[in-house]
Amino acid sequence: LGELAAAGAAVDDGDDMSRLYIRQGCYELTPSGTFSDPGPLAAYQASRPFLEYHLRRRVADLATVTILDHREVTEPLMTADTVTGARIINQTRAVTSTLDADLVVDTTGRASRTHAFLESHGYGPIPHDRTPATWGYSSQLLRIPPGRINERMAFINQGNSAPGVVLMAYEHDTWMLAISRPVKSGGPPKNFTEMLETAHRILPQAISSALHDATPIGNIASSRATAGRWRRYDHMPHLPHGMLVLGDALCTLNPLYGQGMTVAGLQVLALRNCLQEGDFDIVRRFYSAAAKHIAPVWKMNHVNDRPADPNPRLPVRLRNGIQRAALRAATHNIIVTERLLRVRGLIDPPQRLQDPTLLIEILATTLRNPRRKTARSIG
């Protein structure tokens, strides 16, 4: 992390709420004070190419790692009930060879074909859970003169029927502007002008005014690929030894929530722990461990993406009421804000929002402060 900072990544130490602008629904999370444990909330913000360059360099320096460039895996290799390696092709010389392995890990993301490979070898279809693509988004890399924006990030989520905005500082005075919009409201903005119009309507004037001085870098990127898919390898009664999938190849989340790399990192830690315990039944143990990390995030996203029920049942009304009370309290109380950010950042599990001491804090804050809405949803 120190190397990323030294190379120019934007750093927020997590100890100053003035560096963040967060609006959830109609509530601005702008309490005064400092977090009790700012370290886990520190953010090192950089573009994906910047991050991947530095990660690859660090990994390549490891004595136990060899990177084979310009190779493509064409298919895994099997004997009996075990994957023993992969067939690869050298793209520069068009030469095919085999690479033996005790464990093959598929991290090819959304394009993974492991499920099709397993089905073609008689293991049956892999069951999966899905959430629909109800959003689209557009993003644009910008260069903004230093000092024009005090915050390092602005995040606005107005709910599932109004546009959302993320503006995030990157390395070397570059910023990423992303605008999300429900498909039923027209989908992602089609050009930078449309993005700016939406941003100016939603962002605070002190932030949006800086966008007048922004210089676009490259073209906007638009996507409607916001569906979620969790391939339930953990539900399979039988799988071959020696092969597993990880990251988006296992579970693709709605990218608007910004959880993909964190959940993939948690899966890597789960795999490390499984390997440290030995290779016996490693595939099944890994999928079971990974599911424990994925399940609460998947459930939380499913609830957030679900259309509002006009006649919710009592448990749903209670949950929604607690969520609104927590957000309202977070506009005043740094303790509540810290807990919300820790859960959103997957540092703490969602169950921490049901902690009795937190509920008491929310109640006390609500009683001390009159109900007020600080902003309204803007279409």
Label the predicted regions.
Residues 61-203:
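Predominantly flavin-linked oxidoreductase catalytic cores and closely associated redox partners
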Residues 29-48, 85, 179-183:
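Helix-loop-beta segment of a Rossmann-like dinucleotide-binding subdomain
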Residues 53-60, 72, 106, 118, ...:
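Primarily hydrophobic membrane-targeting regions of prokaryotic envelope proteins
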Residues 137-145, 221-222, 290, 296:
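Short, conserved secondary-structure transition motifs
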Residues 38-57, 107, 113, 189-190:
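Short beta-strand to alpha-helix junction loop
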Residues 272-379:
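C-terminal helical "tail/cap" subdomain of flavin- and related membrane-associated enzymes
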Residues 1-27:
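N-terminal FAD cofactor-binding segment of flavoenzymes
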Residues 185-293:
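FAD/FMN-dependent oxidoreductases across multiple families
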